[in-house]
């Protein structure tokens, strides 16, 4: 059986933490920022984690991560 391939788009966007969670960046912070408050923009700089319901899907996309 051939090797499984990682989804390259997902591999660039997610990193695994020491505890096994998947770390991700937040969306909506690249443009159209004038209408967003400073508090919102500050919170968008922080990272986030993949939810439990999405972890099974991510496991298929990233078998070696």
Swiss-Prot record:
Record's protein name: Large ribosomal subunit protein bL35
NCBIfam families for the chain: rpmI_bact
Region of interest (Disordered), residue spans: 1-25
Family affiliation: Belongs to the bacterial ribosomal protein bL35 family.
GO biological process: translation
Gene Ontology CC, one term: cytosolic large ribosomal subunit
Keywords: Ribonucleoprotein, Ribosomal protein
SUPFAM superfamilies named among the record's database cross-references: L35p-like (SSF143034)
Keyword Nucleotide-binding: no
GO molecular function terms noted in the UniProt entry: structural constituent of ribosome
Transmembrane region(s): none
One Pfam family, short name: Ribosomal_L35p
Stored InterPro entries: Ribosomal_bL35, Ribosomal_bL35-like, Ribosomal_bL35_CS, Ribosomal_bL35_sf
Taxonomic lineage: Bacteria, Bacillati, Bacillota, Clostridia, Eubacteriales
């Amino acid at each position: 059986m051939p090797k499984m391939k990682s989804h390259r788009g997902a591999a660039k966007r997610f990193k695994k933490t020491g505890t096994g969670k998947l770390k991700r960046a937040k969306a909506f912070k690249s443009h159209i920022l004038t209408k967003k408050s400073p508090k919102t923009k500050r919170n968008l700089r922080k990272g986030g984690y993949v939810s439990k319901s999405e972890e099974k899907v991510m496991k298929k996309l990233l078998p070696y991560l």
